[in-house]
A protein has these predicted regions:
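A residue-level signal for conserved active-site and pocket-lining positions in enzyme catalytic cores
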Residues: 8, 64, 68, 90, ...
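Short, well-ordered beta-strand core segments
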Residues: 63, 86, 174-175
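A glycine- and small-aliphatic-rich helix-loop capping segment at beta-alpha/alpha-beta transitions
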Residues: 79-84, 102-106, 189-191
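Catalytic core of DAGKc-family lipid kinases
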Residues: 93-172
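Class I SAM-dependent methyltransferase SAM-binding "motif I" and its flanking Rossmann-like core
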Residues: 115-117, 121-122, 174-177, 182-191
Length: 191
């Protein structure tokens, strides 16, 4: 099995968790690769083979995001373009979407042996139009926030889904969410 590792190196424990993940993958004879830039940053501490993003994601069978929920969301935008499944490994204290905690790395054996199921999540493709100006955003796993920016008055928002008009809103902004994002938004409010 070929695995793309996408660690969030801004997280304090990400490098040590990445090192531990690599050791388990080696133990179970899995090949793992990093993005070129990441491999250059960590190559002095971890055996790291780097590939350009497109080659990495085309080559791999699965993507492992190491960090928190934000790391997984960021990695999901990359993985979806190549139709690759993604697994989150929590490198911090709290991650709702991580499939594995840092003290459960032995479960990587199940991944490598093919003993897993894939939970398909809805993602949003968003295009923002303002007059003749149009901007398509990356896919998003959680939600998209459209805000009025620095304007003082309310903005008119016309919301469509697959070309079908949903509604017009006059508001400061709007949050459009997937089921994953709405759950995260609700849980975050409790913390």
């Amino acid at each position: 099995m070929k695995i793309a590792l996408l660690p969030n190196l801004t997280r304090s424990h990400a490098l040590s968790v990445t090192d531990d993940v690599c050791k388990y993958l080696e133990k179970y004879n899995a090949e793992y690769y990093f993005e070129t830039e990441t491999a250059e940053k960590i190559g002095h501490k971890i055996k790291a083979v780097g590939l350009p993003e497109a080659e990495l994601l085309s080559l791999c069978d699965v993507v492992i995001a190491i960090g928190g929920d934000g790391s997984l969301i960021h990695a999901a935008r990359k993985a979806v373009k190549y139709k690759k499944p993604i697994l989150g490994v929590n490198a911090g204290n709290l991650a709702f979407m991580a499939g594995i905690e840092k003290n459960e790395l032995e479960l990587l054996k199940e991944l490598i042996e093919g003993n897993y199921t894939i939970d398909k999540r809805m993602m949003l493709d968003v295009t923002v139009k303002n007059g003749s100006c149009e901007k398509t955003l990356d896919c998003c796993l959680n939600d998209v926030v459209i805000a009025r920016g620095e304007q003082i008055k309310l903005v008119k928002l016309n919301v469509e889904c697959d070309g079908q008009q949903i509604n017009d809103y006059y508001a400061d902004g709007i949050i459009i969410s997937t089921p994953t994002g709405s759950t995260a938004y609700s849980l975050a409010a409790l913390l």
